[in-house]
């Protein structure tokens, strides 16, 4: 892989960029403190902005690593940080990345997550040189699967009781897209 770190990416409505400490208020307000947002995630809702700042600082500290990819999703319409998308796992030997994402409840069902994910897919295939991009979701969160399908990922199957989140042990639906499916070559 040609690791190049978290570069700023832009779409029609979004700027995907590195976290900044001044994103803490938006992050807390727009997604990180909302139990509806974190319901199917592995981290509990944040209860104060100071803990959000500590998380953001940990991200900032990792940005010097060329193989660290973690973007805040900034909505151009209001210049607010409204979610995040990241590579949660790198599988160097198979040129594979696993993507995770979350977005504030006020921004659900607007195509924002799929817009961000599509841009990250393009970046990972074209600049980083991955061969496979994976993502999974709790089967009780079908909207996440719709995002994956909209971005061109193919459903590969469900592994029963193979994952966990804030709901406990869960069935995980697995999706992926391969480089040749993205490029058509």
Please name every model-derived segment.
Residues 43-44, 65, 95:
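Short, surface-exposed helix-loop/turn micro-motifs enriched in polar/charged residues
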């Amino acid at each position: 892989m040609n690791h190049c770190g978290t570069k700023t990416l832009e779409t029609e409505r979004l700027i995907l960029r590195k976290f900044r400490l001044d994103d803490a208020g938006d992050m807390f307000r727009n997604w990180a403190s909302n139990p509806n947002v974190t319901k199917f995630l592995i981290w509990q809702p944040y209860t104060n902005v100071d803990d959000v700042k500590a998380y953001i600082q940990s991200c900032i500290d990792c940005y010097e690593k060329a193989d660290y990819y973690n973007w805040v999703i900034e909505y151009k319409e209001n210049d607010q940080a409204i979610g995040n998308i990241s590579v949660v796992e790198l599988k160097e030997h198979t040129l594979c990345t696993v993507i995770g994402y979350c977005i504030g409840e006020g921004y659900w069902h607007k195509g924002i997550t799929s817009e961000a994910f599509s841009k990250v897919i393009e970046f990972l295939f074209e600049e980083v040189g991955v061969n496979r991009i994976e993502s999974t979701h709790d089967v009780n969160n079908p909207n996440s699967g719709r995002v994956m399908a909209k971005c061109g990922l193919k459903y590969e199957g469900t592994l029963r009781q193979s994952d966990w989140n804030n709901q406990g042990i869960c069935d995980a639906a697995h999706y992926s897209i391969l480089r040749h499916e993205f490029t058509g070559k």
